[in-house]
Amino acid sequence: MSKTKPLSADEISRLEALIGYEFKEKARLDRALTHASARSAAAGNYERLEFLGDRVLGLCVAELLFSTFRNASEGELSVRLNQLVSAESCAAIGDEMGLHNFIRTGSDVKKLTGKAMLNVRADVVESLIATLYLDGGLEASRKFILKYWQGRATSVDAGRRDAKTELQEWAHARFAATPAYRVDDRSGPDHDPSFTVTVEIPGVKPETGVERSKRAAEQVAATRLLEREGVWRKSPTGN
């Protein structure tokens, strides 16, 4: 495993300015930006942090949606939540912040492209949220999440129903058939898996989705098929 230097004092100061929070324990910020390929868990990387950050993000975004869309059904709230906490959304926020300039990775990860690298960028955002939670409590992480997610909460497609439900009704009406979902691949560690799922309807070209849970991957696959067939317009988030 390659040896990676910790973040410098100048880099930490720049990160704190980007985040809008001054950390009590600076080492936590360094760990949040360090991939396992660059440093072991004992030495400090973000593998455990991303697990916690994912849960904190989900809670805060769910709370935001619950208070913002008071007349929305549970299904509508779930559609918004899935879009807002997806790997694509997290990675986009990390890119907007310029976090890729601070991520510590080993040589193996630097060769990654596409979905694999997108997951790394998303994981860093989640680990950063966990670090804020551990250093400053829920209020510190909530403040950060509101800063970057509040505007996006109203920009996702409010009119969309659950993609799987929409696809099933369309398939029944058009082909008298029920969509079938197949898990093609499961990769990655237990704490950060990646699922590849294909949805098939007789007489229709299949579509594939890749996400960090089987359910989310099914939603992505269903969404892509609906968009390709013109049932839905393309999502603003690009999912």
Swiss-Prot record:
UniProt-annotated binding residues for Mg(2+): E50, D123, E126
Catalytic activity: Endonucleolytic cleavage to 5'-phosphomonoester
Location (main, coarse): cytoplasm
Compartmental location: Cytoplasm
Transcription recorded as keyword: no
Keywords of this entry: Cytoplasm, Endonuclease, Hydrolase, Magnesium, Metal-binding, mRNA processing, Nuclease, RNA-binding, rRNA processing, rRNA-binding, tRNA processing
UniProt domain DRBM: residue ranges: 162-231
Domain RNase III, residue spans: 12-137
Enzyme class: hydrolase
Cofactor(s) named in the record: Mg(2+)
Role noted for this protein: Digests double-stranded RNA. Involved in the processing of primary rRNA transcript to yield the immediate precursors to the large and small rRNAs (23S and 16S). Processes some mRNAs, and tRNAs when they are encoded in the rRNA operon. Processes pre-crRNA and tracrRNA of type II CRISPR loci if present in the organism.
Name of the protein in question: Ribonuclease 3
Lineage of producing organism: Bacteria, Pseudomonadati, Pseudomonadota, Alphaproteobacteria, Hyphomicrobiales
Name of the gene: rnc
